[in-house]
């Protein structure tokens, strides 16, 4: 596992965007050989999406031959609702870059057959071989996507019941009214994430410090689903300074020395 220790959320966004752009450009995608990118929603990736849009407008990257798969979607929320992840992604990213509409894949939380929707999503991912880079965030309780504590580390795309804490955390997007937050969501599984060639998780804020500690210094544990990254051959944690407050001093010093050349110029 790599840990990229930065200072601010803006630096995390810039580093993550730069890494995505470098991976896409090094891959040299074509129509017949697209780059497959996994994407999250929420507050954490906002600085990354902003930086990606700026880099696209500066001519540094094209998304014309990029296929995207989003991590999750609420169940029962209309697609046009301002807080659906469909709306979020278009508002903050897709509408500002050159990605073709047919290259965008989002789970349908209003599908008549939820199980079939989840199964087809997995099949479509497999049809491209694999996701080359999956970016994500992490919850205060260590959940990735909507894989809440005690999720199977072998799980695939499925419907999940959201914990009260997750709904409270997300209520800031729903006028701070937890009753407006859906109780269920469709989400890729932990196993789906682990199948990706590379996984990059962004960690922001002191409220995520225990989750980061569990991911880096703890044991692999289904109560902290983020710890599954210890099993991945190419995992990256990109974090700001407040999120590192629970890490041991020697752990942080080790990664600072290891990544010194990779965090320059932000």
UniProtKB/Swiss-Prot annotation:
The record marks 151, 158, 160-161, 254 as: Part of the allosteric site. One of its GO terms (cellular component) is cytosol. It catalyses: alpha-D-glucosamine 6-phosphate + H2O = beta-D-fructose 6-phosphate + NH4(+). One of its GO terms (biological process) is N-acetylneuraminate catabolic process. InterPro entries: Glc/Gal-6P_isomerase (IPR006148), Glucosamine6P_isomerase (IPR004547), Glucosamine6P_isomerase_CS (IPR018321), NagB/RpiA_transferase-like (IPR037171). Its EC number is 3.5.99.6. It comes from the Bacteria. Allosterically activated by N-acetylglucosamine 6-phosphate (GlcNAc6P). Keywords: Allosteric enzyme, Carbohydrate metabolism, Disulfide bond, Hydrolase. This is Glucosamine-6-phosphate deaminase. CDD domains: GlcN6P_deaminase. Catalyzes the reversible isomerization-deamination of glucosamine 6-phosphate (GlcN6P) to form fructose 6-phosphate (Fru6P) and ammonium ion. It holds the Pfam family Glucosamine_iso. GO terms for molecular function: glucosamine-6-phosphate deaminase activity; identical protein binding. Homohexamer; trimer of disulfide-linked dimers. It comes from Shigella dysenteriae serotype 1 (strain Sd197). PANTHER family: GLUCOSAMINE-6-PHOSPHATE ISOMERASE. The keyword Disulfide bond applies. Belongs to the glucosamine/galactosamine-6-phosphate isomerase family. NagB subfamily. The gene is nagB. Pathway: Amino-sugar metabolism; N-acetylneuraminate degradation; D-fructose 6-phosphate from N-acetylneuraminate: step 5/5.
